[in-house]
Design a protein with these regions (language model features):
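Serine-dependent amide/ester hydrolase catalytic core
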Residues: 6-90
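Structural helix-boundary/capping segments
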Residues: 34-44, 51, 89-133
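Generic recognition of stable, solvent-exposed alpha-helical segments in well-folded globular domains
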Residues: 4, 82, 121-124
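Short, hinge-like loop/turn segments at secondary-structure boundaries
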Residues: 1-4, 113-114
Length: 133
């Protein structure tokens, strides 16, 4: 995904480099270290992962996970995307929704994940859960 994101953002990075935060710039720029062969290998690995997840979740409509691996990140500190990356790679629709607050009154969230082309189910479930929190 990094190569795809960097390819998309290249013209904007050139014209508006200072508009990007350091975290985002570093992430996008690191993607330029990959070549075409790396990209093709990554696509093959992506397809293998997709097949395994499709098999693993064949009997489930939705998956519920944490949104973050730790407490709510501060605004000036980027958070980990560890729990989101897998589903971005798969191309599966996912949404993070608020789910109460921690002991410091900071918001907590959960991530809902649906199978491909199940965005309507995902959004209905998210709306229902959010209406109770």
């Amino acid at each position: 995904l990094a190569v795809e994101a960097a390819t998309f953002h290249t013209p904007y990075l050139i014209e508006n480099y200072s508009d990007y935060g350091d975290f985002c710039k570093n992430r996008l720029l690191s993607a330029f270290a990959f070549n075409g062969e790396d990209f093709v290998k990554a696509q093959k690995i992506r397809q293998t992962i997709r097949s395994k997840w499709n098999h693993f979740l064949k009997d489930f409509d939705l998956l519920v996970t944490h949104s973050q691996p730790e407490k709510t990140p501060l605004l000036d500190k980027p958070s980990s995307t560890r729990f989101m990356n897998s589903f971005n790679i798969l191309g599966w629709p996912a949404i993070s929704i608020p789910m109460g607050k921690d002991k410091d009154a900071l918001p907590l969230g959960i991530q809902l994940v649906a199978k491909p082309w199940q965005e309507e189910l995902l959004l209905r479930a998210a709306q229902t859960i959010e209406s109770y929190s």
